[in-house]
């Protein structure tokens, strides 16, 4: 496939040609999870091209297992002096599960710490000429069009100036279901085409039905246009990427014929609320330690986080077609967290999956409030728990299974931590209220005392805290060691103050998130589906009554736990106070952290600053400026009534409607489509028809040229016949 291959359907309606290029259909079959497909794994093109070093696995995974074994032994020794009771056995099991989880992150952090001490530099591939073609995909679902289209505009312009722009095509793949946003997208696309048609090829497609959500959106593109391209560079609606990063990914993929997927580690940007800036700071200071360590030891068995990554089209279409899981949601149906599964399937087929921890210039945004984080995590939690159905898949690499298990534990760890806390509380209350049985039924000259090894328990507590906070400590050490890094966040004093503030605020938020995740897990186990709601990305504020409703159970849980603790002693209450205060103040914490005003205050005084905030990359500055311009361009949105009234506007709209056939002859018609057909057929004028449509029906009409033509033929308003005769 060569760069010169670029024929599209030309039309005079749209500047720059048709909304989408010619289709070149290709197969992307759902993969079997119960048996290894024939021909897998493929033979590597380069000798040892997909082989990883065992020594790195031994250091991180082996180290985590050894550390966990030591901690579990010590915990058992704490209880074993006086004999282990059933409640203590339960606590030992819960401790083992939780410690193994944090030990792996700690050992990855050690590896990342020493790697970052050496300051790894990206491979110099900038001079490599690109002879492959890459489709850059920007999926969007009911997002603000000004954000999405302005980002594509500035990235496309920057890429065109590198001399490599000819090797890339841009695609905005819309799954938008809101008819008003759909029309705004079309307006924004016209502006985008005006700006970019001389230097870039930019396309737009909105699906009529968003089957299988984002994974289905990308799969639809692959089956219809994927064969035109060697690579797919997948972004998210809030993604930004520097041109050097885009070309660097394509060059790395081109240089490694065995690479199936290369994932960048995005930096968080554009946070305005306190919660968003907290996440930005934590991700910037501590995130590289974990991310670099992970990339170092997983090597060719990396992971995919759904965006800001480049994928070899052959590998993706040939190996990563997702099957539907048997049964109904939440555990059956479409695979929600598709990214981990796609990476595992690509690796199963014999392609490498690499985390490019040394490649900067990749950006994304984060939820602005605790509530928005909870909404996103509810969906992610369901998708990750769904991975329990994927774990037994035939032929997966053990590291891929570990990625899936890690994703599951990201949410199951909260119930396990809560159970551990409750078990410890029950042990304390048992010791306080239940009279010990000094002489048991078994004959003994000495009484049985309920004792623990308190010195060993305290030592184990310090070890556990060290393992838990180890990655944070590593990040702070790297920050303080690097003078340039420290200055980029406001200096060492501001950096230390920011770290202290982040630790305190995170400690207050952590118990709230623990209960949110526990609620999500319980909801999923009860069979409730998460649905798919669009994300808020800017303002995280909500009415106080809404926040009280959202956090009512968290506050109640805090009161009950506090009451149980004080029944034992004030000392126990003091020990539990860091977690309890967060629960008691859940509503004001949620309100304050979701506030832009408070976020701006901490920005002014330089707390939680990041290098990207203090000295943003040119691409980020241009994106903000372009977004303001796009907001001005589409401040007067089209309406369906205007489209029906204006023939030129109708032609523009139809030029952007997906050209896929509406429905094969003889196939069942969907209820909503049948209802719309009846409403259009019975309508006496456009005004009466539009008044009858709900939002779902209006979105369907916008995507159906036949219905639009039928509506266009109707009079704009109904005039009774007798009134016409009188006139």
Swiss-Prot record:
Intracellular or extracellular location(s): Cell inner membrane
EC number(s) per entry: 2.4.1.-
Principal EC category: transferase
Chief subcellular location: membrane
Membrane association type: Multi-pass membrane protein
Gene Ontology biological process terms in this record: glucan biosynthetic process
Gene Ontology cellular component annotations, sorted alphabetically: plasma membrane
Membrane-crossing segments per the record: 58-78, 90-110, 278-298, 408-428, 460-480, 496-516, 572-592
GO MF entries: hexosyltransferase activity
Family: Belongs to the glycosyltransferase 2 family. OpgH subfamily.
UniProt xrefs under HAMAP family: MdoH_OpgH (MF_01072)
Protein name (record): Glucans biosynthesis glucosyltransferase H
């Amino acid at each position: 496939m060569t760069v010169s291959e670029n024929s599209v359907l030309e039309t005079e309606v749209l500047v720059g040609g048709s909304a989408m290029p010619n289709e070149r259909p290709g197969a992307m079959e759902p993969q079997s999870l119960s048996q290894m497909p024939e021909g897998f794994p493929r033979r590597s093109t380069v000798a040892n091209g997909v082989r990883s070093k065992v020594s790195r696995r031994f250091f991180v995974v082996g180290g985590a297992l050894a550390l966990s074994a030591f901690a579990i032994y010590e915990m058992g020794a704490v209880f074993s002096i006086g004999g282990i009771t059933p409640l203590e056995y339960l606590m030992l099991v819960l401790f083992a599960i939780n410690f193994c989880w944090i030990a792996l992150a700690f050992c990855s952090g050690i590896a990342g710490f020493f790697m970052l001490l050496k300051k790894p530099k990206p491979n110099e591939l900038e001079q490599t000429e690109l002879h492959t073609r890459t489709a850059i995909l920007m999926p969007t679902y009911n997002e603000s069009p000004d954000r999405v289209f302005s980002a594509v505009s500035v990235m496309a312009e920057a890429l065109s100036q590198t001399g490599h722009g000819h090797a890339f095509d841009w695609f905005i793949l819309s799954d938008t279901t809101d008819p008003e946003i759909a029309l705004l997208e079309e307006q924004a696309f016209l502006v985008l085409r005006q700006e970019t048609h001389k230097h870039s090829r930019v396309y737009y497609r909105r699906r009529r039905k968003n089957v299988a959500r984002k994974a289905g959106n990308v799969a639809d593109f692959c089956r219809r246009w994927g064969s035109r391209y060697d690579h797919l560079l997948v972004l998210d609606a809030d993604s930004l990427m520097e041109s050097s990063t885009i070309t660097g990914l394509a060059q790395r993929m081109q240089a490694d014929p065995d690479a199936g997927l290369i994932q960048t580690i995005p930096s968080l940007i554009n946070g305005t609320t306190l919660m968003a800036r907290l996440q930005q700071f934590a991700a910037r200071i501590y995130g590289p330690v974990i991310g670099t360590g992970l990339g170092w030891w997983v090597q060719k068995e990396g992971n995919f986080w759904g965006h800001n990554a480049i994928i070899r089209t052959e590998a993706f279409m040939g190996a990563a077609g997702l099957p539907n899981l048997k049964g109904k949601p939440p555990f059956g149906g479409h695979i929600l967290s598709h990214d981990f599964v796609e990476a595992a399937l690509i690796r199963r087929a014999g392609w490498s999956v690499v985390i490019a921890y040394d490649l900067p210039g990749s950006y994304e945004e984060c939820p602005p409030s605790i509530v928005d984080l909870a909404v996103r995590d509810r969906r992610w939690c369901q998708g990750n728990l769904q991975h329990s159905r994927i774990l037994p898949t035939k032929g997966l690499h053990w590291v891929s299974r570990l990625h899936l298990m890690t994703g599951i534990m990201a949410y199951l760890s909260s119930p396990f931590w809560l159970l551990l806390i409750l078990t410890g509380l029950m042990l304390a209350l048992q010791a306080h209220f239940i009279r010990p049985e000094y002489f048991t039924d078994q004959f003994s000259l000495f009484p049985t005392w309920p004792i623990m090894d308190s010195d060993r328990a305290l030592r184990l507590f310090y070890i556990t805290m060290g393992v838990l906070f180890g990655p944070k400590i590593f990040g702070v050490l790297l920050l303080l060691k690097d003078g340039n890094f420290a200055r980029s966040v406001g200096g060492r004093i501001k950096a230390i103050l920011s770290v202290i503030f982040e630790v305190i605020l995170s400690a207050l938020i952590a118990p709230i998130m623990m209960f949110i995740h526990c609620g999500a897990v319980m909801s999923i186990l009860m069979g409730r589906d998460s649905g798919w709601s669009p994300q808020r990305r800017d303002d995280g504020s909500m009415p106080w009554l809404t926040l009280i409703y959202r956090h009512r159970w968290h506050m109640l849980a805090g009161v009950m736990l506090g009451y149980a603790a004080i029944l034992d002693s004030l000392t126990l209450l003091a020990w539990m106070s860091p977690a309890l205060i967060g629960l008691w103040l859940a509503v004001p914490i949620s309100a304050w952290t979701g506030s832009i005003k408070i976020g701006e205050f901490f920005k002014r005084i330089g707390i939680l600053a990041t290098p990207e905030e203090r000295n943003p990359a040119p691409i980020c500055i241009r994106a903000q400026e372009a977004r303001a311009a796009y907001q001005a361009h589409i401040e007067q949105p089209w309406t369906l009534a205007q489209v029906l009234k204006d023939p030129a506007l109708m032609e523009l709209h139809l030029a952007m409607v997906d050209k896929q056939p509406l429905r094969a002859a003889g196939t069942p018609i969907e209820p909503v489509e049948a209802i719309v057909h009846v409403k259009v057929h019975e309508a006496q004028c456009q005004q009466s028809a539009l008044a009858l449509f709900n939002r779902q029906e209006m979105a369907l009409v916008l995507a159906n040229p036949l219905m639009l033509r039928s509506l266009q033929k109707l009079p704009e308003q109904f005039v009774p016949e007798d009134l016409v005769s009188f006139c």
